[in-house]
């Protein structure tokens, strides 16, 4: 039976893992979350998330510094990676993979996890890593370019560090960045270089709510309205426009 692929669909995914703090300790996937996105409308079509029980529960902290963080108790009765591997493979294989810093982290962890259970890892039809992408195209407007900083820059709230919440935030960040770049390319004499924040950058150790206090080049919530207005205009003008054609107008944002 041939494996079904979806080369034009985008799957945003994110992994939550333990943080190795001992020599010889490895990463273990503790949570997987993904959304499948329509490339024409940039809308969520399907979602899936699951906690995952590692083989060694001692790698998971008993307590979490976050109110909704992952603790040992939460993963004790969760399925193993092998239990959910088929579902994860079906979501990822043959689609365009998207995420923040996925080339260096999430993609590697997925391959390791499938290798550990002796099964073939899913393969992407393409990869969109928003960290490198936005660092190159959007510059350092949001400081250190972490997802928390980008979300704060656009007034999208505080990053929760839970897989499904993070991928949805990732999609919204890309929409906002693409809108800004599209407008700058359309009206370069009026907008380009004038939307940057001040040169005063918060230190990486400051909390997300402090980052959110950074002076913004627009009133809170106004960019979200502008984003929707631009999407509506594009929809009316080019109802069948795909993600790729939108990006081509935004300095080839995705490549």
Swiss-Prot record:
Its main location: nucleus. The keyword Cytoplasm does not apply. Its cofactor is Mg(2+). It is found in: Nucleus. One of its GO terms (cellular component) is nucleus. InterPro entries: Exonuclease_RNaseT/DNA_pol3 (IPR013520), RNaseH-like_sf (IPR012337), RNaseH_sf (IPR036397). Induction: Regulated by the transcription factors NAC045 and NAC086. It is an enzyme of class 3 (hydrolase). Mg(2+) 1 binds at residues 14, 16, 166. Disruption phenotype: Shorter root phenotype and impaired phloem function. SUPFAM superfamilies: Ribonuclease H-like. Mg(2+) 2 binds at residue 14. Keywords: Exonuclease, Hydrolase, Magnesium, Metal-binding, Nuclease, Nucleus. GO terms for molecular function: exonuclease activity; metal ion binding; nucleic acid binding. Expressed in the sieve elements and phloem pole pericycle cells. Residues 11-174 form the Exonuclease domain. Probable exonuclease required for enuclation of sieve elements. This is Protein NEN4.
């Amino acid at each position: 039976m041939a494996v079904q692929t979806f080369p034009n669909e985008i799957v945003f995914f994110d992994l939550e893992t333990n943080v190795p703090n001992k020599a010889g300790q490895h990463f273990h996937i503790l949570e997987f979350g993904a959304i499948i996105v329509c490339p024409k409308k940039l809308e969520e079509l399907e979602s899936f998330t699951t906690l995952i029980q590692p083989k060694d529960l001692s790698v998971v902290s008993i307590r979490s510094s976050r109110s909704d963080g992952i603790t040992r108790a939460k993963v004790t009765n969760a399925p193993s990676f092998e239990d959910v591997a088929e579902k994860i493979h079906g979501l990822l294989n043959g689609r365009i993979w998207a995420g923040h810093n996925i080339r260096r982290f999430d993609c590697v962890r997925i391959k390791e996890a499938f290798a550990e259970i002796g099964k073939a890892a899913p393969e992407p039809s393409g990869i969109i890593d928003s960290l490198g992408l936005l660092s190159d195209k959007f510059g350092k407007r949001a400081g250190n370019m972490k997802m928390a900083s980008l979300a704060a820059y656009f007034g999208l709230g505080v990053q929760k560090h839970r897989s499904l919440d993070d991928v949805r935030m990732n999609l919204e960040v890309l929409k906002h960045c693409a809108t800004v770049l599209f407008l700058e390319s359309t009206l370069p004499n009026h907008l380009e270089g004038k939307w940057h924040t001040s040169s005063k950058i918060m230190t990486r150790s400051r909390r997300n709510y402090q980052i959110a206090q950074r002076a913004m080049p627009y009133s809170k919530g106004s960019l979200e309205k502008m984003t929707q207005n631009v999407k509506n205009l594009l929809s009316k003008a080019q109802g069948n426009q795909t993600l790729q054609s939108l990006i081509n107008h935004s300095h080839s944002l995705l490549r």
